[in-house]
Amino acid sequence: VWENHRHDDAVMTWPGNQIPAAFTTVKGRKPSVEIHKRRVSIMSVINELIRTEANGTLSFGNYSLAAKSKVEDFEHEGDLYKVKTFKEITKLERNGMFVYESVPGTAVKDFAVTDTTVTFKVEGFEDAQITVQLEDDCEYEVFEDGVGVGGMKTNMSGKLSLSVELNEGREVEVKIVRK
């Protein structure tokens, strides 16, 4: 039985306290049946690789995949998107042009772009180097979880790179604002 809570938290219970083999520990032992009384976080990967959210934003990426997977010609607001993703990289293109890349792979939720701002929530197994396409040769202020991490300038091709500290099961909200 899965009970959904805010964000991606869930409470898990199993009939007769039979814990699935997928929940074994590193040493191969099953955890205590008490696990059904604790809250655990579910990976927020995007199983369909890319989707449009109810609020009109894009979500994409699946960092849990061992093999490269992609979706091409995904239509969103009149543009065609292509996503390539797996544990080592996640890359998004719009109409054949670069938009987002992370190394290693990540899951991105609520990706939105306006004239002056890019916002998204990102999750991954470990810290990631993220590159986004912005306006050429402009200055931006970067925020992670509402905290300013400094000003950055895009290069002549409009790319801005930042490092984000990630831990599986926890999203980091990124906001990039043109100065």
Sequence positions of predicted segments:
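Catalytic domains of carbohydrate-active enzymes that cleave complex glycans
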Residues: V1-F86
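Short, ordered beta-strand-loop transition motifs
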Residues: H5-R6, D110-T117, T154-G158
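C-terminal beta-strand-rich structural cap/linker in extracellular carbohydrate-active enzymes
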Residues: I19, F23-V33, A67-G96, Y100-S102, ...
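A short, sequence-level motif marking secondary-structure junctions
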Residues: R39, E135-D137, K153-K159
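Small-residue (G/S/T/A) turn/hinge positions that recur once per unit in extracellular repeat modules
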Residues: P104-V108, V147
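Surface-exposed beta-strand/loop patches in extracellular or lumenal glycoproteins
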Residues: K121-C138
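Beta-strand signatures of extracellular beta-sandwich domains
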Residues: E141-F143
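Surface-exposed loop/edge segments in extracytoplasmic proteins
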Residues: G146-M152
